[in-house]
Amino acid sequence: MTRYKATIAYDGTDFAGFQSQTNQRTVQEEIEKVLSKLNSFEPVILQGSGRTDSGVHAFGQVIHFDLNGKARDLERLRFGLDTQTPADIAVKKVELVPDDWHARYQKHEKTYEYYLENSVTRSPFHRHSKAYFRYPLNFERMQGAMVKLVGQHDFTGFTASGSSVDDKVRTIYQAEIIQLDKENFKFIFRGNGFLYKQVRNMVGTVIKIGNDRMPVSQIDKILTSKNRNFAGPTAAPEGLYLKEVKYEPINEI
């Protein structure tokens, strides 16, 4: 058996998320179908760096999987995966990794981007690739809120109730908002890990602050109280992208 690491991109619009689910179309299931063909039709179970929810996209999700036999030509393997998976999945890179390398448990940091259209009418061309908010937003207020998210915090107040993780302390290295033009914003979050729906809950809160329906100091209150009820709504999934998963260098195999 040989272990491979792959970097993939996908349009999450027509998926019920990344992780396999019964009677649902998922990214994991579609890739595993192709991997099985390339593995003499023996089942292959892949592991991802983490899951993304229904409607969430990825520029740089990372997976690993094992295939029978010796190491294969990496470009041929990448090409085979890329051309046989559906059009809403792209396989960007395939690498060899040690047998004990794990996409989820290897030390890494993740970067998410969130795209928001802020206009009177929503563009029909971006309805699956950007979130939408029609009411006025104050850029300076949102900037002030984002700064407060940087650092090591207990993010319980920004976690969905379905989270089963006990330790909710995470470190955010970068929390930035960029005004791309008068109608479009990009949020950037880079950290050592994120809880279930944490990014979308943070974005929903910052939007509410930008719309002057919460004070900038609300961020402090949420972090201190660890109370989800003090945070804003969960932002829509279509604006969220897993941009990059960055690992420590792999030793030569």
UniProtKB/Swiss-Prot annotation:
**Cross-referenced CDD domains:** PseudoU_synth_EcTruA
Q: Which residues bind substrate?
A: 112
Q: Which GO terms describe its biological process?
A: tRNA pseudouridine synthesis
The domain of life is Bacteria
Query: What Gene3D superfamilies does the record tag this protein with?
Result: Pseudouridine synthase I, catalytic domain, C-terminal subdomain (3.30.70.660), Pseudouridine synthase I, catalytic domain, N-terminal subdomain (3.30.70.580)
Question: EC number(s) for this protein?
Answer: 5.4.99.12
Matching SUPFAM superfamilies:
Pseudouridine synthase
Catalytic residues as annotated in Swiss-Prot or TrEMBL: 53 (nucleophile)
Q: Which UniProt keywords apply?
A: Isomerase, tRNA processing
> Mind listing the GO molecular function terms for this protein?
RNA binding; tRNA pseudouridine(38-40) synthase activity
Q: What name does UniProt use for this protein? A: tRNA pseudouridine synthase A
Name of encoding gene: truA
